[in-house]
Amino acid sequence: MFRFILTTMLLAAILGCGGDNADKYTQEGFVYFQQQKYDEAIASYEKAIKAEPRAAAAYNMIGMAYRFKFNQQGAPEFRQKEMAAFQKAVEIDPKNWVAMINLATDHYADGEKGKAAALFKKALELNPNHPEKAEIEKMIAAGEPKP
């Protein structure tokens, strides 16, 4: 499942970035990401954003790199940067369901289940056949107010 998600994110990153340089840097960043060289990946994604400031997929991948750094080191600033990157990706491309799910997952993990539920719902509207739909629906239910 993890490979499917990463492959989906790479495809979204390549399609979501404009210009040859942005594509090149996004692909370079993904190679670093796969090698678990997260600082190098972030630097490459930042170059992609410099080449194409509306590269929502590059912001999403920066968020993923910070997520892995946070998971390894637990530094709160990595979580903040992770969430900010996902938020920026969603702001740039409100149909970017991948970034939306990533941001929702962070809110859910941080106990903000109401915020998470709203994002998860929107993501499922955009991608109703998501392979993890059943699990996402459980998280939506956990975040909705009880009657």
Predicted regions and their residues:
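C-terminal motif of bacterial Sec signal peptides marking the signal peptidase cleavage site
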Residues: 13-16
